[in-house]
Amino acid sequence: TAKWKEETEQTLRNPSYVRIVFGVTDPDAPRLSRPTDNGHLPYSDIDSVDVGTTAPSTYQTLERNRFILDGKNPLPPESNPIYQGYAGLTISGDAGAYTTKPLVKISFGDYVQFPGLTFQFDDSMGDYPNSFRILAKKDSVSVFDKTYSPDTTYWEMADQIPLCNELSFYWLNSNIPHRRARLLSLVYGLVSRLGSDDIASCSSTKEIDLLSSKIPKEEFEFTLIDTQRRYDPENPSGLWEYLESRQPVNYQNGYEWSDGSIEWIPWGLSYSTGDCDVSRSGMVAEV
């Protein structure tokens, strides 16, 4: 665009940024999962929660102080709605508590274990539970039961889930009164959004054969500042034992405009090889 050309032709250009979405997940868990719930709106689609097919914004509903006429969230159509993850039926009260606790239960066709869980609640309207119970069972016997207090719509639960074949999530209280429970996305593992403060360096290479006798090869390497020592093999509660190939790595390039805003441009999507080098201090990891 003309604006982009004008900005990039300046003698002194504004800084650029890199953002990487990376984590340790179980890529086979969605295939084994069978999610159910205890009540939902007609356009709710619980089956899409763990496969990444939800819509970027939620529909407007007649919940108090939620119906905002800003054009960002559309009304649900009478036919052919866009299914957008889990949208519960029960609305919380004046104090944010639910009389009937919204429940999402996921049964697995085999035993699974996770280094943690990553939840995406309602980003578009800022709705999330500020009291949230996670229960894991193995053959109907409880092996994990904790109540948390999330403080954001994109929330990582970093406690390890032991071997189990059933997960249950209970919405106990909403951060905003008179709101439904919503869950747009669930990842079986820990997914971090790495920014400039977390990345020490990164590089991208691409090999293309001019005769097209070989498949093009593209590699992306990055070094992160691992202050929590998640990838340190000497950390018994870290993620080292869960590292494997086929972990998705999404990276974007950002350019800062003169008004201070940052435009993010998709750079690439690749998958990890499972290799990770950690410095002697355990504070820097190269992936």
Where are these regions (language model features)?
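Assembly/oligomerization scaffold segments
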Residues: T1-V287
